[in-house]
Swiss-Prot record:
SMART domains: malic (SM01274), Malic_M (SM00919). Homotetramer. It comes from the Bacteria. PROSITE patterns: MALIC_ENZYMES (PS00331). PANTHER family: MALIC ENZYME-RELATED (PTHR23406), NAD-DEPENDENT MALIC ENZYME, MITOCHONDRIAL (PTHR23406:SF34). GO terms for molecular function: malate dehydrogenase (decarboxylating) (NAD+) activity; malic enzyme activity; metal ion binding; NAD binding; oxaloacetate decarboxylase activity. This is NAD-dependent malic enzyme. Its EC number is 1.1.1.38. GO terms for biological process: malate metabolic process; pyruvate metabolic process. InterPro entries: Aminoacid_DH-like_N_sf, Malic_enzyme_CS, Malic_N_dom, Malic_N_dom_sf, Malic_NAD-bd, Malic_OxRdtase, NAD(P)-bd_dom_sf, NAD_malic_enz_proteobac.
């Protein structure tokens, strides 16, 4: 029987119900519920449906003149009536996703302490490192199945935001629910407050975090270890998603814990999965295969290298050697093309550095090989930007790429929109509409020579909700590389352009529920095949996905004392 059709028995009544966002219905309480729960007079007389409430809330939403005010308004609804919040977002997903998450969430993080209104999630501060167990027990969420955790050091492209980074776990979990059907009762945002190196925050009298320079080294590692152990004791089956950790910490943390606990890093693995899925769709639309592409990256941090490694793995799965695949991927950072003779390369960069001997014949060979040099010599067919620096995909670079590639695949993925390497409008005009474009943030359609091009948003929200749903539905104990690869292939199978030869590269957000279920099935099936969860037939897995898919509908309430 559907949970929404079963009554929910509650042991308390009166104002306490109205103050509990997971169960509050506001004006939608029935006459019987108002009597039994002592709510008469506490809400207006009229009994409304959730759609009537959502209609009013949408009118109020549209009355605000800027996106930050809209974000604050939606967060207020979320903190008072979560079911209504998710019905409202579900009804207007394309309009509201940029408000509850990127790009607006970046501004919300910057102003977190100034705009703080009500508690949500947990703040675990370093001075309380010996009381992490107690803090976890203080959570009002008792059946946590998904945690998104950040330390606030690398928030989007905005850098160190301290505890203001809490806006990211809150926003990400909102998407787990609105896109992936994860019940909000099973989600918990957490910020690890380890100080901040942002002088503006340290000097801001309104900053609400621990006023101390960031800890590092052994102190930091021991704090993360204590946190991970405590979470595993409190909720042993929960999925932990790492979010917006700095480059120096993100990869080491992932490598340390991915085999011990059920966890993944969305910036590294989620971004890689959605990018590979988008590339597979673009290749199919262009009538080619990924293993035939030459790929150039601008940005060689943990996210860029994570994407590159996923591309290499997919190329290898398509039949070429690892060595050949790596020779087809060029990583460019602020110092130029990564080369194997460069000192101070990070461990995750070393395997992606080009061999000097292999490029010695290039024109303009020097110690600092620019992106334009790479385009002119390597002749890439794919260009991916994860630099966080705006405008670096110049007209000269894009035109040079198009001169040797009739249908270049160009993904300027940096967030927010103010930091994108090039706008879709410019890219499509420079390539006469021939480029296959996907971006990290939302952009309006572009018209070139009378033809309208819808811009695909290579957004992690197409991937991580489905991964989370697949993990929950299958009971997977870990998130394996094969599960992530399966999510990429499943996303590509949903591409309108690849399937129909027209339309956007990625599905519309209005189709996100079916996309997430499709990805969840692919992820869960691999988990079962790898022995990471209990055996189950395809039918049982699909039924589990449906059973775990929460819908924003009010349940009937009964009082336990009656």
């Amino acid at each position: 029987m559907d949970d929404n059709k079963r009554p929910l028995y509650l042991p308390f009544a009166g104002p306490a119900i109205l103050e509990a966002p997971l169960i509050n219905k506001g004006s939608a309480f029935s006459e019987e519920e108002r009597i039994f729960f002592n709510l008469e007079g506490l809400v207006p007389y009229a009994i409304e449906t959730i759609e009537e409430q959502a209609s009013r809330a949408y009118d109020q939403f549209r009355s605000f003149n800027n996106d930050l005010d809209k974000h604050i308004y939606l967060r207020n609804i979320q903190d008072t009536n979560e079911t209504l919040f998710y019905r409202l977002v579900q009804n207007h997903i394309s309009e509201m996703m940029p408000i509850i998450y990127t790009p607006t969430v970046g501004l919300a993080c910057e102003r977190f302490s100034k705009n703080y209104r009500r508690n949500r999630g947990l703040f675990i501060s370093y001075p309380n490192k010996d009381r992490i167990d107690d803090i976890l027990n203080n959570s009002t969420r008792q059946k946590v199945k998904i945690i998104v955790v950040t330390d606030g050091e690398r928030i989007l492209g905005l850098g160190d935001q301290g505890i203001g980074g809490m806006g990211i776990p809150i926003g990400k979990l909102s998407l787990y629910t609105s896109c992936g059907g994860i019940s909000p009762a099973y989600t918990l945002p957490i910020t690890l407050d380890v100080g901040t190196d942002n002088p503006q925050l340290l000097e801001d009298p309104m900053y609400m975090g621990w006023r101390h320079p960031r800890i590092g080294g052994e102190e930091y590692a021991e704090f993360i270890e204590a946190f991970m152990q405590a979470v595993h004791v409190r909720w042993p089956d929960t999925l932990i998603q790492f979010e917006d950790f700095a480059q120096k910490n993100a990869m080491p943390i992932l490598e340390r814990y991915k085999e011990r606990y059920c966890c993944f890093n969305d910036d590294i693995q989620g971004t890689a999965a959605v990018t590979v899925g988008s590339l597979l769709a673009a290749c199919k639309a262009a009538g080619t295969e990924l293993n035939k592409q030459r790929v150039a990256f601008l940005g060689a941090g943990s996210a860029g290298c994570g994407i590159a490694e996923a591309i290499v793995a997919q190329m290898v799965s398509e039949g070429i050697s690892d060595e050949q695949a790596r020779s087809q991927v060029c990583m460019v950072d602020r110092w130029g093309l990564l080369l194997d003779n460069m000192p101070n390369l990070l461990p995750f960069q070393q395997k992606l550095a080009q061999k000097c001997a292999d490029i010695s014949h290039w024109n303009n060979f020097s110690d600092n090989i620019s992106l334009l040099d790479v385009v002119n010599n390597a002749k890439p067919t794919v260009l991916i930007g994860v630099s966080g620096a705006p405008g670096l995909f110049t007209e000269e670079i894009v035109r040079a790429m198009h001169s040797h590639c009739p249908r270049p695949i160009i993904f300027p993925l940096s967030n927010p929109t103010s930091r994108v390497e090039a706008t879709p409008k410019d890219i499509l005009h420079w390539t006469s509409g021939q480029a296959l474009v996907a971006t990290g943030s939302p952009f309006e359609p572009v018209v070139v020579d009378g033809e309208t091009y819808e811009i695909a948003q290579c957004n992690n929200s197409f991937i991580f909700p489905g991964i989370g749903l697949g993990v929950l539905a299958s009971g997977a104990r870990h998130v394996s590389d094969a599960m992530l690869m399966a999510s990429s292939r499943a996303l590509a199978e949903c591409s309108p352009l690849a399937i129909n030869g027209s339309g956007p590269l990625l599905p519309k957000l209005e189709d996100i529920h079916s996309v997430s279920k499709h990805i969840a099935f692919a992820v869960g099936k691999v988990a079962i095949e790898q022995g990471l969860s209990l055996p189950a037939s395809d039918e049982l897995l699909m039924q589990s996905i449906e059973d775990n898919f929460w819908k924003p509908e009010y349940r009937r309430y009964k009082r336990t004392s009656f």
